[in-house]
A protein has these predicted regions:
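A short, N-terminal "cap"/entry segment at the start of jelly-roll beta-barrel domains
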Residues: 1-42
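Conserved short histidine dyad/triad with adjacent acidic residue
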Residues: 27-33, 38-60, 80, 90-94, ...
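Glycine- and acidic-residue-biased ligand/ion/polar-headgroup-sensing regions
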Residues: 52, 62-76
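A short hydrophobic beta-strand segment most commonly corresponding to one strand
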Residues: 88, 101-112
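Short, Lys/Arg- and Gly-enriched loop/turn segments at beta-strand edges
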Residues: 96-100
Length: 112
């Protein structure tokens, strides 16, 4: 018996990672690519693969931002982070330091 047939997906955006396209992910240095894994109400869940030497561009967060490191290491706001680490940045906070020397894969959730 298929118990999922009566479950509504209204308001849901479920994306299969193997069906999502990689798109360029911009920064101030190095290369990265991303897969958009879901969007809702202006927010998105994004899987990012950053190559060694990638650095994000400084910016202010208009909305909160959440990050989870899946693999590798990165530095955010002067703090070293590795697989399993994460951060939450409040709306209005300034992101002035984001870099990976060795490369990293991470999930970032934010609103545009």
């Amino acid at each position: 018996m298929d118990q999922t047939r009566d479950i509504s997906l209204e308001g849901w955006n479920i994306v299969r990672a193997d069906e999502a396209d990689w798109v360029p992910w911009t920064g101030s240095a190095g290369e990265a690519r991303a897969k958009i894994l879901g969007t809702a109400d202006g927010s998105m869940v994004t899987l990012v693969e950053a190559q060694p030497g990638y650095a994000g561009s400084p910016h202010e967060h208009a909305h909160s931002e959440f990050n989870y490191v899946v693999e590798g290491t990165l530095r955010s706001q002067g703090q070293q982070m590795s697989a399993g680490d994460g951060y939450a940045a409040a709306a209005g906070s300034t992101h002035s330091d984001f870099e990976t020397e060795a490369g990293a894969t991470y999930i970032v959730i934010f609103k545009i």
